[in-house]
Regions:
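Histidine-acidic metal/acid-base catalytic patches
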Residues: 1-109
Length: 109
């Protein structure tokens, strides 16, 4: 997700949600590196915490649920946090789990 966001819709041709749906429809989506960035290139950008970039990551998680993705979703390039690397990993995983729960709740209604 993060690399796609770096290129942005203009650079990649479609947004990340459309890309998820496209690759899933061709059975070519196996592993998702879940991260966010401040903005797409060509402007200077930086990696952000998952909830602090330009992409609505809830939309990405919803797209993964819609295509019934059953592969691996991992946090990727976690920015440093006070408390060390483990704090950033814990934050990222907890945020991702909350997104999964929120999206699953939407689909169960």
């Amino acid at each position: 997700v993060g690399c796609w966001l770096e290129g942005g819709e203009a650079g990649m041709g479609v947004g990340v949600v459309e890309a998820v749906k496209h690759f899933a429809s061709q059975n070519q989506l196996f592993k998702v590196h879940f991260r966010n960035v401040s903005n797409p290139m060509p402007e200077p950008w930086s990696e952000t915490l998952i909830d602090n970039g330009y992409q609505d990551m809830h939309e990405v998680m919803r797209a993964l649920r819609e295509v019934e993705f059953d592969g691996c979703i991992i946090p990727d390039h976690i920015p440093a946090m006070l408390g060390g690397h483990r704090a950033g990993v814990a934050y990222s995983i907890a945020y991702m789990r909350a997104l999964v729960q929120a999206v699953n709740n939407e689909f169960s209604e």
